[in-house]
C-alpha cells in the first residue's frame, strides 16, 4: 500500500506532554491524545484537510467489548439476582478479594444490568486485558464504577463519605452518580448491544473521541471531517438488525462486506487494535517513571489541593510494585 509509517519513542511522547494542556484547556485523560497529535502533525505536512474514520465502531458495533458484554450479561441474567448479589458480597469480604481476578468476579456478580457491566471502565484496551486474565469476565456494579471514577479525590475513596471541594458538600462519587442520573432509564431500555452502543454515542464518542481528534488536529491547523457521522449514515446504521453488525467476535460486518470489494480478506481479517501507546511499560522505564514521580510528590499534591496525596501514592505503589493498573 501507499502509506506512511510513524514510530513514536518514549522521548517524543514526553516532549508532547507539556503541550497538551494548551490544546485541551481541561484535564483529558485519554493517552491516545499523544499519538493522535503526532499523526495529525505528520499529516499536516502534506495536506490541510483529512478524513477521520471515527464513529464506525460505535455505529456498527466494532468494539470487542460489545461482544464480551453481550456474552457476559447473557450468562449473568440467567442466575437469580439475590443469589448473585449474595455471592458478590461474600467475595468482597474475603481478605484476598483485592487480587484482580477475584475482585473482578465479585463485582461482576453485583451488576444489575448490562450498562452496569459496561460502565465499570471506559478504558477499552485495559479492560480487554483484564477480561482475558479473569476467564472472560468483566467487573461490574455501578457503585464499583462510581468508586473507580472518583478514586484519588479527597473524600472520593472508600466508604467514609468525606466531603471535598466539588461544591455543595458533594464528593467525587456524588458527582459521577449525579451525571448518570440525568439520563432516563427507559432511554437505554433496549437490547444489550444497542444499549451499550447508545451510551457510547451519547457519552464516550462526543466527550472523548471527537474532542481528542478535534483538539489535536486543530493544534496543527489540520481540518478533520468525519463522514461516518453524516446524518444518513447514522440513521442507516441504527436501522440495521444486530445480525448485520456483529456475529460472535466479529464486528462492523456491513462495513467489512463493503471493504471486501476493494481489499483482500487476508488483509482485513485480523484482530482489532486500538490506537494506543504502551503507557504502562513507558511509565516503568527510568525516564518517564522519574518524571511521573516528580508530579506525584506528596508535598506537591497537597499544595495543589486537588488530589488526595495518600490515595495517589497508594495507586502509584500498586502500579509500580504489583502491576495493578487503574486508568
PLM region descriptions:
Residues 12-16, 58-62, 276:
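Short catalytic/ligand-binding loop motif for oxyanion handling, primarily in non-cytosolic enzymes
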Residues 4, 25-29, 73-78, 243-247:
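Short, polar/flexible loop-turn hinges at active-site or ligand-entry regions and domain interfaces
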Residues 38-97, 204, 210-233:
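Active-site adenylate/phosphate-handling loop in enzymes that bind or generate adenylated species
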Residues 18, 37, 41, 257:
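Active-site phosphate/pyrophosphate- and oxyanion-stabilizing loops and adjacent acidic/basic residues
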Residues 18-22, 44, 66-68, 282-284:
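Short low-complexity, flexible loop/linker segments enriched in glycine and/or proline
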Residues 1-23, 49, 172, 179:
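A conserved beta-strand->alpha-helix junction
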Amino acid at each position: 500500500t501507499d502509506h506512511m509509517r510513524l514510530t513514536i519513542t518514549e522521548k517524543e511522547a514526553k516532549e508532547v506532554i507539556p503541550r497538551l494542556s494548551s490544546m485541551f484547556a481541561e484535564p483529558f485523560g485519554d493517552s491516545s491524545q499523544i499519538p493522535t497529535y503526532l499523526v495529525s502533525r505528520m499529516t499536516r505536512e502534506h495536506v490541510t484537510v483529512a478524513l477521520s474514520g471515527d464513529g464506525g465502531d460505535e455505529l456498527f458495533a466494532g468494539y470487542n467489548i460489545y461482544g464480551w458484554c453481550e456474552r457476559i450479561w447473557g450468562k449473568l441474567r440467567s442466575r437469580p439476582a439475590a443469589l448473585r448479589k449474595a455471592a458478590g458480597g461474600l467475595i468482597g469480604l474475603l481478605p484476598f478479594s483485592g487480587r484482580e481476578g477475584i475482585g473482578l468476579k465479585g463485582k461482576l456478580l453485583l451488576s444489575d444490568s448490562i450498562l452496569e457491566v459496561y460502565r465499570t471502565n471506559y478504558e477499552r484496551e485495559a479492560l480487554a486485558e483484564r477480561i482475558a486474565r479473569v476467564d472472560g469476565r468483566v467487573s461490574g456494579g455501578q457503585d464499583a464504577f462510581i468508586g473507580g471514577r472518583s478514586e484519588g479525590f479527597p473524600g472520593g475513596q472508600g466508604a467514609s463519605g468525606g466531603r471535598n471541594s466539588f461544591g455543595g458538600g458533594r464528593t467525587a462519587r456524588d458527582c459521577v452518580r449525579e451525571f448518570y442520573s440525568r439520563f432516563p432509564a427507559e432511554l437505554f431500555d433496549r437490547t444489550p448491544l444497542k444499549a451499550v452502543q447508545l451510551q457510547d454515542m451519547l457519552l464516550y464518542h462526543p466527550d472523548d473521541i471527537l474532542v481528542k481528534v478535534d483538539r489535536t488536529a486543530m493544534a496543527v491547523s489540520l481540518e478533520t471531517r468525519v463522514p461516518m457521522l453524516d446524518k444518513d449514515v447514522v440513521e442507516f446504521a441504527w436501522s440495521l438488525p444486530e445480525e448485520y453488525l456483529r456475529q460472535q467476535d466479529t464486528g462492523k460486518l456491513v462495513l467489512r462486506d463493503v471493504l471486501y470489494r476493494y481489499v483482500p480478506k487476508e488483509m482485513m481479517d485480523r484482530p482489532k487494535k486500538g490506537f494506543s501507546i504502551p503507557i504502562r511499560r513507558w511509565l516503568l522505564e527510568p525516564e518517564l517513571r522519574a518524571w511521573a514521580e516528580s508530579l506525584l510528590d506528596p508535598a506537591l499534591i497537597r499544595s495543589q489541593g486537588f488530589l488526595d496525596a495518600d490515595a495517589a501514592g497508594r495507586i502509584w505503589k500498586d502500579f509500580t510494585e504489583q502491576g495493578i493498573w487503574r486508568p
